[in-house]
Regions:
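Polar, enzyme-active/binding microenvironments
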Residues: 1-168
């Protein structure tokens, strides 16, 4: 799968893509434009990178699709965002939360993004796993850093068992 987050103080913006084969890392095709703190959805050969910030720019709504070697610009998010979570696939993804702290969620259908049910707890810098119809999000900065975990059933979010320790 593909994933990425950088919630530390900016040390530079990167356009690098790396592939992991279970044993070692290799470099893939660079993204068009250096960014940080966006979110990813999908697999190594069919992935999305959405949101983030770039040098001297505010949050972006840009979405880029990866085919295993190169990136292509596709339909933008409705709300520019950063420090959010991404789940799902290249044709059925979620972009979850935003910074500054927000509960907003959008679903992607392979062409365009649509706003769907908001999280119960607004936050940023959270983790997320799953599909567009069955996802979990956990932790994050509400503030303060939270233990909250929520499950998505394709329609709405439900609070479920919390993390033992607050994390972001």
């Amino acid at each position: 799968s593909i994933s990425g987050v950088n919630d530390s103080p900016p040390v530079g913006y990167v356009a690098d893509t790396f592939h992991y084969n279970g044993t070692s890392w290799s470099e893939g095709g660079d993204t068009p434009g250096a960014r940080q703190s966006g979110a990813a959805s999908g697999l190594l050969t069919a992935a999305l990178w959405h949101g983030g910030t770039g040098p001297g720019s505010p949050n972006t709504a840009a979405t880029k699709q990866y085919n295993g070697s190169s990136w292509t610009e596709v339909g933008n998010l409705n709300t520019a965002r950063t420090s959010h979570a991404g789940t799902g696939t290249v044709t059925a993804a979620l972009a979850i939360a935003n910074s500054p702290v927000a509960a907003i969620v959008e679903a992607y259908d392979g062409t365009s993004w649509t706003e769907v049910g908001d999280l119960n707890t607004a936050r940023d810098s959270l983790g997320g796993v799953g599909t567009q119809t069955s996802s979990l999000v956990f932790g994050g900065n509400a503030p303060p850093v939270t233990v909250n975990t929520e499950a998505w059933d394709g329609t709405s979010w439900t609070e479920v068992n919390n993390l033992a320790t607050a994390r972001r």
